[in-house]
């Protein structure tokens, strides 16, 4: 199994992302339920335009964040650190992402918040189930070189 497939399988089983944005010397983090898109290597989430993190992001911004489980022992630790770009989706792109998101999280139908995409450009996956401190790395540029 290649690195991206292993990371993608794990991300698809999780549902909460923490991401951080930076604007004019200020940092802010947020959490949300997400849907992983393996084809585009992206996370889709809903967040209101009036939130601090959305206003700091504007239409598009660099982002870093994490996805992690809550294991009870060190040997079961698995988690992702990432960097990428967050952007607010519009039009057909937004409609398609919302439809997929609502299939996974039907309760979100009551939320009028816009859909955002976090395009993952670099991922470090720590997976202690493969051995203590085992890390898998993926770069978007490396995928283009392998294709």
UniProtKB/Swiss-Prot annotation:
Gene3D superfamilies referenced in this protein's UniProt entry, alphabetically: Electron Transport, Fmn-binding Protein, Chain A (2.30.110.10)
Domain of life (superkingdom): Bacteria
InterPro entries the UniProt entry points to: Split_barrel_FMN-bd (IPR012349), UPF0306 (IPR011194)
Family: Belongs to the UPF0306 family.
Classification via HAMAP family: UPF0306 (MF_00764)
Stated name of the protein: UPF0306 protein YhbP
Organism the protein comes from: Salmonella schwarzengrund (strain CVM19633)
Gene, per the UniProt record: yhbP
């Amino acid at each position: 199994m290649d690195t991206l497939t292993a990371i993608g399988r794990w991300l698809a089983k999780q549902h909460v992302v923490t991401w951080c944005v930076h604007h004019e010397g200020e940092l802010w983090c947020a959490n949300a339920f997400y849907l992983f898109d393996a084809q585009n290597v992206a996370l889709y989430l809903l967040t209101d335009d009036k939130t601090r993190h959305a206003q700091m992001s504007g239409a598009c911004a660099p982002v870093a964040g994490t996805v992690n489980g809550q294991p009870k022992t060190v040997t079961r630790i698995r988690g992702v650190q990432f960097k990428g770009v967050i952007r607010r989706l519009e039009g057909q792109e937004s409609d398609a992402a919302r439809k997929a998101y609502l299939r996974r999280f039907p309760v979100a139908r009551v939320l009028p918040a816009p859909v955002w995409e976090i395009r993952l450009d670099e991922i470090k996956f720590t997976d202690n189930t493969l051995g203590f401190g085992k890390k898998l790395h993926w770069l978007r540029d490396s995928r283009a070189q392998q294709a």
